């Protein structure tokens, strides 16, 4: 899709859904101006990129992850590494959607990275509900929005999926009005429960994905931490505190464990290594290639909670 078509599509989606936004500076209502910018009544204005995304970041905070990490994660996702997770999340959202009196729901992926997870979910939701394939409209259609603090990651996300609203934003102060979303996804990303609860509808759902004890165990072992082949551990990981924190703040509906082995083709291995912070500052390329690694463990916990 050309840059002109991307910005036109993004403009259409944002214009139809401008009421979900609040000004990240003053909190005022926002509207889309003719010159492709989202503005409030006080004159604060945020440009819509010709690449099809909004930059609503007001602070100078530098993103933690590099563009290379997100490019690699996109390739890993395209290879099907997270497909069982995407299927499970789609099922959770579809179940919620089916019980909702609305004909369409609003979904936010908070900390969406390069957008692979949300893109996969939106595509599968359209397959389940063909009548809702025209997304991001006010009148009864599904609305999918992805945000991340990394401009690089959002640029990558906007390359692939024109029917999702993509925004650069900070989780510490989300640029959305109270009660704007029915479902908030938080996938392998830091959380801000106060903001999530604020932007969720009265009985909205927070779906948080956290790593399990054996997530990427082979990589953790290779770089000096995690479970060894014989079962002993050098440095174990537990998500117990994260789960407890979730349970204290949300009305827990379900806890789902997802575990499987993924066969890694040789050409995918460098991208798998680069997509995780576990390998920062490590000679992981050499370590993994020397061990002839071909199977990687995926161990995830999906926490589903309702807004209290």
Where do the language-model regions lie?
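Conserved SAM-binding strand-loop segment of SAM-dependent methyltransferases
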Residues: 162-174
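Conserved SAM-binding loop of SAM-dependent methyltransferases across substrates and taxa
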Residues: 114-132, 136-138
């Amino acid at each position: 899709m050309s840059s002109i078509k991307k910005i036109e599509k993004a403009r259409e989606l944002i214009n139809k859904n401008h009421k979900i936004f609040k000004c990240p500076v003053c909190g005022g209502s926002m509207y889309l101006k003719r010159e492709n910018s989202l503005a409030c009544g006080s004159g604060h204005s945020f440009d819509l990129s010709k690449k099809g995304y909004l930059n609503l970041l007001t602070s100078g905070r530098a993103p933690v992850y590099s563009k290379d990490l997100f490019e690699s994660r996109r390739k890993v996702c395209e290879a099907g590494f997270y497909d069982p997770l995407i299927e499970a999340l789609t099922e959770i959202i579809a179940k919620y959607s089916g019980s909702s009196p609305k004909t369409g729901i609003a979904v936010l992926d908070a900390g969406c990275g390069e957008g692979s997870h949300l893109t996969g979910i939106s595509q599968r939701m359209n397959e389940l509900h063909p009548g809702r394939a025209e997304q991001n409209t006010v009148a009864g259609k599904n609305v999918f929005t992805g945000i991340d603090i990394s401009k690089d990651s959002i640029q990558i996300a906007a390359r692939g999926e024109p029917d999702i609203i993509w925004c650069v934003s900070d989780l510490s102060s989300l640029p959305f009005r109270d009660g704007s979303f029915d479902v908030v996804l938080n996938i392998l990303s830091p959380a801000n429960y106060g903001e999530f609860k604020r932007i969720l509808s009265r009985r909205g759902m927070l779906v948080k994905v956290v790593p399990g004890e054996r997530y990427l165990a082979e990589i953790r072992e290779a770089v000096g931490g995690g479970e060894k082949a014989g079962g002993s551990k050098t440095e174990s990981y537990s998500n117990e505190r994260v789960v407890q924190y979730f349970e204290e703040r949300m009305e827990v509906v379900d806890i789902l464990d997802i575990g499987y082995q993924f066969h890694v083709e040789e050409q995918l291995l460098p991208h798998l290594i680069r997509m995780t912070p576990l390998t920062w500052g490590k000679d992981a390329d050499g370590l993994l290639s020397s061990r002839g690694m071909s199977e990687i463990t995926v161990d995830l916990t999906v926490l589903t909670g309702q807004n209290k």
